[in-house]
Amino acid sequence: MAKKNHQGLDANLIAQNKKARHDYTVTDTFEAGLVLTGTEIKSVRARRVTLKDGYAQFHNGELWLMNVHIAEFAGGNIFNHDPLRNRKLLLHKKELKKLQGELTAKGVTLVPLKMYLKHGYAKVLLGLAQGKHEYDKRNAIKKREQDRQIDRVMKHY
């Protein structure tokens, strides 16, 4: 079990993409390792990561994480990393083949949902997702509001 800090939050959670669950319907999730440089892992441990605009894509049979911002390390020197560079994702070959087959469908993409540390290694939770239409988002908001209303009424009984 992950360690909890004094606020009750998961101590190993680095960043979370809350907007992804709102904008996409996530059908499946995969845990992948990241290939990072020294200054990148230091910035990750300092929780200076933004997953908001990120996505994963195949290039030459390898899966790459694109457009994820890992801030430059403050104590870095001229060898500091580029904050938006593409980072290689590490998955088993079987998982890569499965993902490559599923990503061929129209409208399906791979988005990062969470980044966390597991046994000292940076991991990213990827979601196989399909984009929601505007009316899907409105229906989700309407359903959430109805659930809240039911909870309020049931609280008094």
From Swiss-Prot:
Gene Ontology MF terms in the entry: RNA binding
CDD domains reported for this sequence: SmpB (cd09294)
Keyword terms of this UniProt record: Cytoplasm, RNA-binding
Biological processes, Gene Ontology terms: trans-translation
Entry-linked PROSITE patterns: SSRP (PS01317)
Keyword Cytoplasm: yes
Protein name, UniProt field: SsrA-binding protein
Organism placement in taxonomy: Bacteria, Bacillati, Bacillota, Bacilli, Lactobacillales
